């Protein structure tokens, strides 16, 4: 599934540079106005970090539940511990290339989550990041093998198998 790199809409299509839902053209973080960033991040508590934005938590869980599928904007480089924890109606998450870190328990207890692609840029995944995600059967990861920075227990209480060297087209 493709996601708009700007608004996270699951309706974006490969090769399209302007999303039909948000009318945003993909542009680098430094070219976005504060208002554009605030609009794109309206569902999240977030903070600026050295080289991007960290999602701290979901502040509008109802919005996430209504969409079911969420794409994280391209300028997010970190997802904090427990940021999406207990978003029980979250079914799909689109993680952008450029994301570096997924914190402890970031998606723990997302009981309906079944579709995840982890881009190669992710060098750290914390303990229990996908713990108790019971509907998650397969996780597609771009890395050829588990990177050293991923906690050995990142899939705690989750029976998903990992398909290494995957592409987001799989």
Question: Model-found features: residue ranges?
Answer:
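Structural signature of tandem-repeat unit edges
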Residues: 32-54, 62-78, 88-101, 111-124, ...
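Cys/His-rich microdomains that often coordinate metals
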Residues: 8-12, 26-27
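Short Cys/His-rich micro-motifs in 6-15 aa windows
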Residues: 22-31
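Short cysteine-rich clusters marking metal-coordination/redox-active sites
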Residues: 4-7, 19-22
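Consensus positions within tandem repeat domains that build extended binding/scaffold surfaces
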Residues: 60, 81-83, 104-106, 126-129
């Amino acid at each position: 599934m493709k996601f708009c790199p700007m608004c996270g809409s699951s309706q974006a299509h490969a090769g399209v540079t302007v999303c039909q839902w948000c009318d945003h053209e993909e542009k680098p973080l430094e070219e976005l106005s504060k208002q554009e960033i605030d609009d794109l991040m309206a569902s999240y508590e977030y903070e600026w970090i050295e080289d991007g934005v960290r999602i701290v938590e979901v502040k509008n869980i109802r919005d996430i539940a209504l969409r079911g599928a969420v794409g994280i904007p391209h300028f997010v480089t970190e997802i904090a511990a427990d940021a999406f924890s207990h978003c029980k109606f979250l079914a799909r998450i689109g993680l952008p290339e450029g994301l570096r870190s997924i914190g402890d328990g970031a998606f723990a207890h997302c009981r309906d989550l079944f579709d995840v692609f982890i881009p190669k840029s992710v060098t750290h995944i914390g303990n229990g990041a996908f713990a108790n995600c019971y509907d998650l059967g397969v996780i597609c990861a771009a890395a050829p093998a588990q990177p050293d920075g991923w906690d050995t227990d990142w899939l705690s209480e989750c029976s998903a198998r990992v398909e290494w060297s995957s592409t987001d087209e799989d």
